[in-house]
């Protein structure tokens, strides 16, 4: 494990070899890249960096499904990805980015050839990230396809983070959040080493922040206890950047979407976590020191933002 930590640290720290000020980045991902769309553009702008960012998104999409979608892309009508875009280099409506999603959706080969991307990112679905056997052979196949269709692009891997303690999958896997991190960290490191790819270490930054704040869960409520909560009572996440709880109706995919109830999301970053993710991405992509960033969203207090920026930089530098 120690050798893996050193290897991943080197993969992360090497991003400072070259500093860029303008990049076109395509993310082949899911909701864990959708969250990168929230604050990364604003952090990049504050750091004087020009970032054109596009996200091919299917919620919860694993590498296996991404590759299956590539194999189906011979049918030009097969456009399974919604596309989120942040385009700063020119008017989005006049830019080549519109080629990515002429009908509002896209497939991977089409998107890869629509622009001269500087960087293309991949990642495993969070629910499979701790188990390297789920990566293959799909990661190898996807990497080969990216190299074929976008040979000018550097491929990077976003290391997705471990869940907050309330996620029931941790119980199924018999893992704590820290143990989930250790396993996914090793899995991503194995893939990076195999293909000599750099890592965007979002997971490490989340761990750094949890340690440095620190985040200590004083009470984990049982399902029975949570069922007894009354609006507006919600469980505490103790400052964690992952996880949130609220009262309201569900999302479109929830069977009880029309029911007003306590909703919990222990796997995605909350708004504060999205700022941390943005700092990691900008530091990693552009090789800049985000501890000097003067931007923070209004909902993140300055003292908390300082901890986040330091956690992000330490992760990217491999410290």
Please provide the spans of the model-predicted regions.
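Conserved SGNH/GDSL esterase-like catalytic core that processes O-acyl groups on lipids
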Residues: 34-139, 164
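Positively charged n-region of N-terminal signal peptides that target proteins for export
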Residues: 1-4
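Alpha-helical cap/lid subdomain in secreted, periplasmic
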Residues: 104-271, 283
